[in-house]
Curated annotation (Swiss-Prot):
This is Cyclic pyranopterin monophosphate synthase. The keyword Lyase applies. The active site is at D128. NCBIfam families: moaC (TIGR00581), PRK09364.1 (NF006870). Its EC number is 4.6.1.17. InterPro entries: MoaC (IPR023045), MoaC_bact/euk (IPR047594), MoaC_sf (IPR036522), MoCo_biosynth_MoaA/MoaC (IPR050105), Mopterin_CF_biosynth-C_dom (IPR002820). CDD domains: MoaC_PE. It catalyses: (8S)-3',8-cyclo-7,8-dihydroguanosine 5'-triphosphate = cyclic pyranopterin phosphate + diphosphate. GO terms for molecular function: cyclic pyranopterin monophosphate synthase activity; GTP 3',8'-cyclase activity. Belongs to the MoaC family. Disulfide bonds: none annotated. The gene is moaC. Homohexamer; trimer of dimers. It is an enzyme of class 4 (lyase). It comes from Vibrio vulnificus (strain YJ016).
C-alpha cells in the first residue's frame, strides 16, 4: 500500500508540495445517490416541488462546491478547473436520484476531491430542498468512478 502523501516524517499533516510535478490533463468522475420515497421523487420529477427546480439547484450547488473544494477540505490545493459538469438522473424504479460529476483541468494535482465534493454537495442540496417533505432520505454511496492523468495513471471502478 502507498504511503499517505499528506503526512510528514513527524506524523504531521501538511499540504503536498506539487511545485516540481509536471502539468498534465487530469479528469475525475464521481457519483452519489439520494434514496427517497416514491412520492418525494415524483415531486421532483413532475416539477411540483414547492421550492422550485430541485435538479437545477443541485446542479449549480455541485458546480459551486467543486470550485470551493480547496476552501472546504484543508489540505486540498486551490485549482483552476477547466470543466465541472454535474448530471442528475431520477431512477424511478429504485426511488433514487443518481448524481454524476466530472471535473477536469490541466495542472499538477488531481481533481478527485473536486468531483467527489461536487457530487456530495449536489446530494446534500437535494436533501435540503426535500427535507420538509421527507426527513428519512438516505445519501449514499458516494464514490470515485474514474480518474485519469498524473503519475498514478488511470483508475476506473470495475462494473
Amino acid at each position: 500500500m502507498s504511503q499517505f502523501t499528506h503526512i510528514n516524517a513527524s506524523g504531521e499533516a501538511n499540504m503536498v508540495d506539487v511545485s516540481a510535478k509536471a502539468e498534465t490533463v487530469r479528469e475525475a468522475r464521481a457519483e452519489a445517490f439520494v434514496h427517497m420515497a416514491p412520492e418525494t421523487l415524483q415531486l421532483i420529477v413532475s416539477g411540483q416541488h414547492h421550492k422550485g427546480d430541485v435538479f437545477a439547484t443541485a446542479r449549480i450547488a455541485g458546480i459551486q462546491a467543486a470550485k470551493k473544494t480547496w476552501d472546504l477540505i484543508p489540505l486540498c490545493h486551490p485549482l483552476l478547473l477547466s470543466k465541472v459538469e454535474v448530471q442528475l438522473e431520477a431512477i424511478e424504479a429504485e426511488n433514487k436520484v443518481r448524481i454524476e460529476s466530472v471535473c477536469k483541468l490541466a495542472g499538477k494535482t488531481g481533481v478527485e476531491m473536486e468531483a467527489l465534493t461536487a457530487a456530495s454537495v449536489a446530494a446534500l442540496t437535494i436533501y435540503d430542498m426535500c427535507k420538509a417533505v421527507q426527513k428519512d432520505m438516505v445519501i449514499g454511496p458516494v464514490r470515485l468512478l474514474e480518474k485519469t492523468g498524473g503519475k498514478s495513471g488511470h483508475f476506473k471502478v470495475e462494473a
